[in-house]
UniProtKB/Swiss-Prot annotation:
HAMAP family attached to this UniProt entry: CyoE_CtaB (MF_00154)
InterPro entries: Protohaem_IX_farnesylTrfase, UbiA_prenyltransferase, UbiA_prenylTrfase_CS, UbiA_sf
The species this protein was found in: Geobacillus thermodenitrificans (strain NG80-2)
Transmembrane segments: 33-53, 62-82, 111-131, 132-152, 159-179, 185-205, 229-249, 251-271, 287-307
Superkingdom, taxonomy of origin: Bacteria
Enzymatic reactions: heme b + (2E,6E)-farnesyl diphosphate + H2O = Fe(II)-heme o + diphosphate
Localization in the cell: Cell membrane
Name by which UniProt lists this protein: Protoheme IX farnesyltransferase
Length: 307
């Protein structure tokens, strides 16, 4: 009897822990924590470069760092939550999205919507603690992602990837404008790098998940026009990245070498796809390369300023 009682007491203690763990898992899925984290890398890089080029000291402006990263994280998380609410009808048809709480019903859709709106509101207020420009840029990202991408182009046009790339290119600009609202070539180049990076990244993903997108009725380029055209477009987008690092020449020769090697390597891998017979394998390689590319490039920008 004593052993049974001990087991029951242990079970009671573990239940709250399991519930909390499940809650955070579901919350992470709703806000798409992976997207939030990756975008915070580019947000931080944009902010760091703004400190560097304006001569402002990082450690003397930690309040700006906090409000920028906190605000950007909430704005991005809120946008993703609203996206989950809107896409719950098509997410059930895709393997990678069918377990989201909005599909399984473990989180009520209306609560997910209000969560998203609340996060965007708090995030915007946080960005306002830095500059009005940063808050406006953040809201531009929200409007583009929620309305122009999710509600309009995603289900209707193959250009959905391009439209969605606008919102994905906003985070480094948020980071920069939180420090300096004046026009500068650097945030423009960061925006273009992110804008051009996304089509090859997401088109490679679309090739990997082509049949899932087809089942969901989403007109991704490989679904509508096939793999060959998709591969050619991916190569064009990657090629457009080649000159951009040279506009950041003030970061030094080592950075230019790293960036150029990354760009040329990605382009060569893309061209290899024209001869490679296994399109899915090639798409997987391109997708993984794109993830490493983004991380290495933006980390290299930061390192270049302190090396």
């Amino acid at each position: 009897m004593a052993d049974l009682k001990a087991v029951q007491e242990a079970d009671v203690r573990q239940r709250p822990q399991a519930s909390i763990k499940l809650f955070w898992k579901e919350l992470s899925a709703v806000v798409k924590i992976g997207i939030v984290n990756s975008n915070l890398i580019t947000t931080f890089a944009g902010m760091w470069l703004a400190f560097y080029f304006t001569g402002e000291r990082f450690l003397e402006n930690l309040h700006i760092v906090f409000f920028t990263l906190f605000g950007a994280a909430l704005v991005i998380a809120g946008s993703c939550s609203i996206n989950n609410f809107i896409d719950r009808d098509i997410d059930q048809h895709m393997e990678r999205t069918k377990t989201r709480p909005t599909v399984t019903g473990t989180m009520e859709p209306r609560r997910v919507l209000w969560l998203g709106v609340t996060l965007v509101a708090i995030g915007t207020m946080s960005l306002l603690m830095t500059t009005v420009t940063a808050a406006i840029v953040g809201l531009i990202g929200v409007v583009t992602y929620v309305f122009l991408y999710t509600l309009w182009t995603k289900r209707n046009y193959t250009l959905n990837t391009v439209v969605g790339s606008i919102s994905g290119a906003v985070p480094p600009v948020i980071g920069w404008t939180a420090v300096d609202s004046d026009f500068h070539i650097v945030p423009l180049i960061l925006f273009l790098i992110m804008f051009l990076w996304q089509p090859p990244h997401f088109l490679a993903l679309a090739m990997k998940r082509c049949e899932e997108y087809r089942a969901a009725g989403i007109p991704m380029l490989p679904v509508v026009h096939g793999f060959e055209m998709t591969k050619r477009q991916i190569i064009v987008w990657v090629a457009c990245l080649l000159p951009l690092p040279f506009y950041l020449f003030s970061l030094g020769i080592p950075f230019l070498i790293v960036a150029t090697v990354l760009n040329v390597g990605w382009l060569l891998l893309g061209l290899w796809g024209l001869k490679m017979k296994d399109d899915i394998k090639w798409a997987k390689l391109m997708f993984v390369y794109s993830l490493n590319y983004l991380t290495i490039l933006f980390v290299a920008m930061v390192i270049a300023t302190i090396w």
